[in-house]
């Protein structure tokens, strides 16, 4: 190698392979690159706080319905219940006995009304419609009614028989008197004929009743005026006596001919008897209807009191217990026992609730993106992305300062809903914006938010 080339190589090494070219220049280039990157590249700015999974809505507040002791308690945190499931049962008081008493009384009154309606139908139709002997005596009442109606019929029949007998006797007496009248009239005619024969001197038939008197007159001498006067006087005396008897007979005849009317009020008597019984039945039915209403009202009241002796689920859902009453065996009426949340699987969404210090709340707004990460199981974490849906207008005061309540509603997949539980705690990251790295570190250095 030529000596001049060696000199050039040594010069080159001395010129370009010194400390400045080996360290300072690369460092300067790296610094320029980092400064350029820090100026151009951006960092997401976020806030982090604790958050819990809450329901998107509350289905029902489960309150204590009695001051009595709790005998059965099926309330459990995050327990899935169906509509109608028994949750709490209290010790029964006097309302249980009262309810049974009203129920028994109501059954008896309804049975009594049914039997009374059988009596009403039997009275209306005159036939026994009772399927069996009743314990209220209504069938016996119907039998008494039938007996009374029978007595009325028998009495009327007997009365009519007596009247018929009396009428027959009156008719017979009248006929006999009529015969006497006819006979007396015939006798009077005979004596009148005899009188005429004596006075005129005519002959008299032998079958005439006064023929013997006429013969006696004839035998004494017709020419003797005194005899004729005596004979006429005797005949007139007989006629006068017969006419007196005839007048008496006619009076008797007129009195004996009266006929008594037969008893004709049986139908009205029977109808009156039926009406009396039906009116009484109607009154009893009205009273029974009132008693039934009172018993039903009492039973309903006692039933409501009994219903207060147990608490059931109003619909399907998940239980969240009130920690203040969950371990108590006696809870005041009206106190909150638990809340019923919708099932996450069926609802398909949940609400994330967090509290943020008042010094950071100005950096977030409704609509900002958030990410929730579960922390209870590091090996099986869940990540939920959502946006802020509400920020409380006023802060909640605590010992650690003032905090604002933040809520974010998120939709869940079926897999997420199956793994998630109400009340699970996690970390909630809120994306508040972006800064260049240069600006970020500058703010950190200057202690700016």
Curated annotation (Swiss-Prot):
The keyword Cell membrane applies. One of its GO terms (cellular component) is plasma membrane. The keyword Transmembrane applies. One of its GO terms (biological process) is establishment of competence for transformation. Its main location: membrane. Residues 1-20 are cytoplasmic. InterPro entries: MesE/LcnD, MFP. Keywords: Cell membrane, Competence, Membrane, Transmembrane, Transmembrane helix, Transport. Gene3D superfamilies: 2.40.30.170. It is a single-pass membrane protein. Residues 42-449 are extracellular. The chain crosses the membrane at residues 21-41. It is found in: Cell membrane. NCBIfam families: bacteriocin_acc (TIGR01000). Required for induction of competence. Belongs to the membrane fusion protein (MFP) (TC 8.A.1) family. This is Transport protein ComB. It comes from Streptococcus pneumoniae serotype 4 (strain ATCC BAA-334 / TIGR4). The lineage of its organism: Bacteria, Bacillati, Bacillota, Bacilli, Lactobacillales. The gene is comB.
């Amino acid at each position: 190698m030529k000596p001049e080339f060696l000199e050039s190589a040594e010069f080159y090494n001395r010129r370009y392979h010194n400390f400045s070219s080996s360290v300072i220049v690369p460092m300067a280039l790296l610094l320029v690159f980092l400064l350029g990157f820090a100026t151009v590249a951006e960092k997401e700015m976020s806030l982090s706080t604790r958050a819990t999974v809450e329901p998107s809505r509350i289905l029902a507040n489960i309150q204590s319905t009695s001051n009595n002791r709790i005998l059965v308690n099926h309330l459990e945190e995050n327990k899935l219940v169906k509509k109608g499931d028994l949750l709490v049962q209290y010790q029964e008081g006097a309302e249980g006995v009262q309810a049974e008493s009203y129920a028994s009384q109501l059954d008896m009154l309804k049975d009594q009304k049914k039997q009374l309606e059988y009596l009403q139908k039997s009275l209306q139709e005159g036939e026994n419609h009772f399927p069996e002997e009743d314990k209220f005596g209504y069938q016996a009442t119907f039998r008494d009614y039938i007996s009374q109606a029978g007595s009325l019929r028998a009495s009327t029949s007997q009365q009519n028989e007596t009247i018929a007998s009396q009428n027959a006797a009156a008719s017979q007496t009248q006929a006999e008197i009529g015969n006497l009248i006819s006979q007396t009239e015939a006798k009077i005619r005979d004596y009148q004929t005899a009188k005429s024969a004596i006075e005129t001197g005519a002959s008299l038939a032998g079958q005439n009743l006064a023929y013997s008197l006429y013969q006696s007159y004839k035998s004494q001498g017709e020419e003797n005026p005194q005899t004729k006067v005596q004979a006429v006087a005797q005949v007139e005396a007989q006629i006068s006596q017969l006419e007196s008897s005839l007048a008496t007979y006619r009076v008797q005849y007129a009195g004996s001919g009266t006929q008594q009317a037969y008893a004709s009020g049986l139908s009205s008597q029977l109808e009156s008897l039926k009406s009396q019984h039906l009116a009484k039945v109607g009154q009893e039915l009205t009273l029974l209807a009132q008693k039934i209403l009172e018993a039903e009202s009492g039973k309903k009241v006692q039933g409501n009191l009994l219903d207060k002796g147990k608490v059931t689920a109003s619909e399907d859902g998940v239980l969240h217990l009130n920690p203040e009453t969950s371990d108590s065996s006696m809870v005041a009426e009206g106190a909150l026992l638990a809340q019923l949340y919708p099932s996450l699987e069926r609802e398909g969404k949940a609400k994330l609730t967090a509290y943020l210090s008042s010094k950071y709340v100005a950096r977030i707004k409704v609509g900002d993106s958030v990410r929730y990460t579960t922390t209870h199981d590091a090996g099986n974490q869940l990540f939920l992305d959502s946006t802020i849906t509400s920020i409380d207008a006023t802060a909640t005061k605590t010992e650690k300062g003032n905090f604002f309540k933040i809520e974010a509603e998120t939709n869940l997949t079926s897999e997420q809903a199956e793994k998630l539980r109400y009340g699970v705690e996690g970390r909630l990251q809120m994306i508040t914006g972006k800064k260049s790295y240069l600006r970020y570190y500058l703010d950190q250095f200057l202690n700016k938010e």
